[in-house]
Amino acid sequence: MARASSSAAAAFLCALATLVAAASGARLAVRAGGTGLTVRAGGGASATAVFALGSFWRSEAAFGCLHGVLRTSVGYAGGSKPNPEYRNLADHAECVKVEYDPRQIQYKQLLDVFWASHDPREVFGQGPDVGNQYRSVIFTNGTLEARLAALMKEREQVKDRSSVITTKIQPLGAFYPAEPEHQKFELKRKPFLVQLIGNLPEEELLSSTLAAKLNAYAAELCPPKTQKRISSKIDEIAKKGWPILRDI
């Protein structure tokens, strides 16, 4: 029995490793036809991933400090209502869209953050946020992402079979950007940080890699060493009379 269990685990890990390699190394070939791959102005390729994991205010911050993440934004997906709004989501979920460089970070690493940043076993919400709009969903772009998401969902399930993982895995349909006041929410709660990067207009704030990182920093979701490094950089800038922060 132990030998069979060991063989099953080995097979699972082998399948997972194969899919990780395919989803990263083969991404350009597989996804060039459509849904998740774009070409940046500098010639490099970027990919997008969309997740629902509770309130999108904090969810956006969970991904902003990752090396290789280019920008983040929040919105609505997974429902049938055209043009949903925050006060009228209907059957949509609050979600975060992550644009990243697949040469620097793998889709699997984004999934790891997804699982670690919420409780996928909760039903009808997350923590104090109750409602269908806070459900757990992995929105996939293509077969490779769907298969990898399913394998990692099973990995999470086998950790504890006393309760069921509620996360749904479904193809990404339309993504509707949320209203400006919901973008970079954690960052906007710290006006001095917004001022520190030059009070960027909403469009630039939405597309800024620096703003995505500071949004994570404001929520204290960067790794401890990174949090400390950014704090030191901000202190240094403040001592110089608050010039504009260009990078962290």
Language-model features, listed with the residues they occupy:
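Flexible coil/turn and secondary-structure edge motifs
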Residues: A2-I248
